[in-house]
A protein has these predicted regions:
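N-terminal metal-binding scaffold of metallo-dependent hydrolase/deaminase domains
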Residues: 1-42, 53-55, 381-385, 402-403
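Divalent metal-coordination and catalytic microenvironments
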Residues: 8, 23, 28, 52, ...
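C-terminal cap of metal-dependent C-N hydrolases
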Residues: 8-11, 351-353, 357, 369-404
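Metal-associated gating/positioning segment near the N- to mid-region
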Residues: 53-119, 137-144, 209, 233, ...
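Non-catalytic positions within long, well-ordered alpha-helices that form the structural scaffold/packing
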Residues: 89, 96-97, 179, 239, ...
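Surface-exposed amphipathic alpha-helices with a cationic face
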Residues: 114-117, 211-220, 310, 338
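Metal-coordinating catalytic core of metallo-dependent amide/deamination hydrolases
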Residues: 121-290
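His/Asp/Glu-enriched, well-ordered alpha-helical/loop segment
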Residues: 220, 285-381
Length: 404
């Protein structure tokens, strides 16, 4: 069946096309982007009137945790170990229905989940995976607690090796183990974080030399490295060592911004993440007070940091850290990017064409003839309507031409 979405405003991943357009979908691909009313005159086709609506490429979220279902992880201590995998099926469905058709998982999802989506066992966004998070001992990704217990969050299993490593030999081996387990990219922590109760987001983790070994090992297998990096010293260590993207970037300084521009490093802000922690705490989640205090402390610095990076021209790709907050609300990040100074077109591009470049995937992130029919129909004309609130205006989502 040919589907024709008629008389819509179209954002193609880079710009708004003039006038209104008919988008014709056949066989999982966009076969035509014609002037409004000119897409198809075949009565057998399925014509859907999109007057007053905007069609954008399927959104790419460059930072999710599909096996995590919220910041309040204390229940994990009591849940069966396998529950996380069944919950991830619901998380993937919510992600799709929220308008996200491609994700870069930043730790937790293993090769089995990816294969389940690819083979049609479950429905979910297309994905690349990190498998687990690499961290130094005592770092942001080391979940051994001062109580002596190990948090079940990202606990190792046969498909998800531990990511904790130290020293040049140690990080080399762990990188290879994660790649062996099916990692498409490597996720590291080069600073402390908000959710780790006993470290500081401003403090560095892993040495620059350790990060360089990780980058080299990943590159040897055609993979890139994403770095959880919040404080400026750890951001700069990661950028100098050659990571592809900085995640969060809460305390960027001018030297860090200049380095990112020089090296072409992407920034994935995840503005939703600290807000999600605060919302969870206000809803009664049993989070450590130190975690909630850190989340409150970083929010304004985070916004200012991203605004300065954007003004300087650092490439910004959309990422949410979904799994800290709810899955399915990912497009709220577009609203938050607009609030820190990105134009509507820039905020949409962050989740489409810029994100596709970060992933080095030319099959997604654009709406054009011959491209995959990953599309989101949004209520309202985004050329003139405020993009903020887009997350509540998702009207329809298509994944390779199939209505989700």
């Amino acid at each position: 069946m040919v589907t024709v979405l008629t008389h819509a405003t179209v954002f193609d991943g880079t710009r708004f096309l003039p006038g209104t357009r008919d988008v014709v979908i056949d066989g999982g691909r966009v076969t035509s982007v014609a002037e409004g009313g000119q897409g198809s005159h075949d009565a057998a086709d399925d014509h859907i009137d999109c007057t007053g609506k905007t069609i954008i490429p399927g959104i790419i979220d460059c930072h999710v945790h599909l096996t995590s279902s919220g910041a309040a992880a204390s229940s994990n201590f009591h849940d069966p170990f396998s529950l996380q995998f069944f919950q991830s099926v619901a998380n993937m469905e919510a992600t799709l229905k929220g308008g996200v058709t491609t994700v870069r998982d930043a730790g937790g999802t293993d090769l089995g989940a990816k294969m389940a989506v690819e083979t049609g066992v479950v429905r979910g966004p297309r994905m690349t995976i990190a498998v687990n998070i690499m961290s130094q001992t005592g770092g942001h990704g080391d979940f051994h607690l001062v109580s002596g217990a190990d948090s079940p969050f990202l606990a190792p299993h046969p498909g998800r090796p531990s990511g904790v490593a130290d020293g040049l030999d140690g990080v080399q081996r762990t990188t290879r183990e994660l790649l062996r387990a099916g990692a498409d990219h490597i996720k590291i922590c080069s600073t402390g974080g908000v959710l780790s109760p006993r470290d500081d987001p401003r403090h560095s983790q892993f040495t620059e030399a350790e990060i360089a070994v990780i980058v080299a090992e990943a590159a040897a297998q055609g993979a890139s490295v994403m770095s959880h990096a919040q404080g400026a010293p750890g951001i700069k260590n990661a950028v100098r060592a050659g990571v592809r993207s900085i995640e969060h970037g809460i305390y960027l300084d001018e030297e860090a911004i200049d380095l990112m521009l020089e090296r072409g490093t992407y920034l994935v802000p995840t503005l939703q993440a600290p807000q999600a922690v605060i919302k969870a705490a206000e809803a009664g989640a049993g989070l450590p007070p130190s975690v909630v205090e850190k989340a409150r402390r970083v929010i304004e610095a985070h916004r200012e940091s991203i605004a300065r990076a954007h003004a300087a021209g650092v490439p910004i790709a959309l990422g949410t850290d979904a799994g800290v907050g709810p899955h399915g609300e990912n497009l709220e990040e577009i609203s938050l990017l607009a609030e820190v100074g990105l134009t509507t077109a820039e905020a949409l591009a962050a989740g489409t064409s810029v994100a596709a470049r970060l992933l080095d995937d030319n099959q997604v992130g654009h709406l054009s003839e011959g491209g995959l029919a990953d599309l989101v129909v949004v209520d309202g004309d985004l050329r003139t309507a405020d993009v903020r609130g887009i997350e509540s205006r998702v009207n329809a989502v298509y994944l390779e031409g199939e209505l989700v």
